[in-house]
Regions:
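Flavin-dependent oxidoreductases
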Residues: 4-86, 90-101, 110, 119, ...
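Small/polar loops that bind or transfer phosphate-bearing groups
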Residues: 21, 228-229
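C-terminal catalytic lobe of FAD-dependent flavoproteins
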Residues: 66-72, 79-80, 91-225, 232-236, ...
Length: 244
C-alpha cells in the first residue's frame, strides 16, 4: 500500500491517505506532490450583520444577478433573527487577509439597497470578511469548479480544492463523496457506535434565570459575555468549538 510521508521538526509522519482540504493553501500542498500544477487565488468576501430589528425586512434570501465573480450581494434573514448582507468578491494576493475595508462595506450596503431599500448602515452590529478558495484555470474559457479527486499518479492523495460557493451547501455531500473515494482506496470498517448527531449548544439568551445560574455554576465561562448585542458568552463559544 502506498504511504505518504512528511518530516516535520525531525519527526516522520506516515499515512496511507492524505486529504488535501487546505482551502486557499490547497494549491501549495498539491504542487508539492503533483506534476500538473494548480493555482488558487483568495477571493475576499465582506459582510454586514444587521441588528435584529432589521430581521423582518425580508422573509427569504434575496439574490441579485450573478456574475463571473459569484452570486453577488444577497440579503438574508438569519436563524437568530438578524439580517445578513453580503458578500463582496475581490481577488487579493494575501492568503491571510481577512480584514474588512471601508470600500467593501460601503459596496455591501449600496448594492444590498438595490434589493431592500430600507437597509440602514447604522443598524450594522458587526462586520467580517472571509476568503473563498478560487481555483484559477490557465484557459479562461474553462469553467471553475470543485476539484475533488484522487491525484493522477499519486495513489492515496485526494484533492478537495477550490471549494467556493456553493461549498457550504455542498459540504455534507462532498464529505460523503470523499469518504467513498477513501473507501475505494483503503477499505475500512465503519464504526458501529458512530454518533451522527451533535449535542446542542446552550444559549444564555434563551435560557431561564435558573438555567443561566446552573450553567454558570457548572462553568464560570458562561458568565463572561463576549457579545452584548446577542448575549453570547465565552462558554457558548467554547462549547461550539469543542463540538466540531
Amino acid at each position: 500500500l502506498f504511504r505518504s510521508q512528511v518530516q516535520v521538526d525531525g519527526e516522520i509522519f506516515e499515512a496511507p491517505i492524505v486529504i488535501n482540504a487546505a482551502g486557499v493553501y490547497a494549491d501549495e500542498i498539491h504542487n508539492m506532490i503533483c506534476e500538473e500544477k494548480i493555482r488558487i487565488v483568495p477571493r475576499r468576501g465582506e459582510y454586514r450583520l444587521m441588528d435584529k430589528n432589521c430581521g423582518d425586512l425580508v422573509n427569504s434570501t434575496i439574490f441579485q444577478q450573478p456574475s463571473k465573480m459569484g452570486k453577488g450581494i444577497l440579503v438574508t434573514p438569519t436563524v437568530h433573527g438578524n439580517l445578513l448582507v453580503g458578500p463582496t468578491a475581490e481577488d487579493i494576493p494575501d492568503k491571510q487577509d481577512v480584514d474588512t475595508t471601508a470600500e467593501g462595506l460601503a459596496k455591501v450596503l449600496n448594492l444590498g439597497s438595490n434589493s431592500v431599500d430600507a437597509l440602514d448602515g447604522r443598524q450594522t452590529i458587526t462586520s467580517f470578511a472571509g476568503l473563498r478558495a478560487h481555483l484559477v484555470h490557465e484557459d479562461p474559457a474553462e469553467k471553475s469548479d470543485f476539484l475533488i479527486e484522487e491525484a493522477a499518479g499519486h495513489p492515496g492523495f485526494i484533492d478537495v480544492a477550490g471549494i467556493e460557493s456553493p461549498g457550504l451547501t455542498s459540504a455534507p455531500a462532498i464529505g460523503e463523496y470523499v469518504a467513498q473515494i477513501v473507501e475505494n482506496i483503503y477499505p475500512a470498517e465503519r464504526k458501529a457506535d458512530f454518533v451522527d448527531t451533535r449535542k446542542g449548544i446552550p444559549s444564555m439568551a434563551l435560557a431561564t434565570e435558573e438555567e443561566r445560574e446552573a450553567l454558570i455554576r457548572e462553568n464560570p465561562a458562561f458568565a463572561n459575555v463576549i457579545c452584548r448585542c446577542e448575549l453570547v458568552t465565552e462558554g457558548e463559544i467554547l462549547s461550539a468549538i469543542h463540538r466540531l
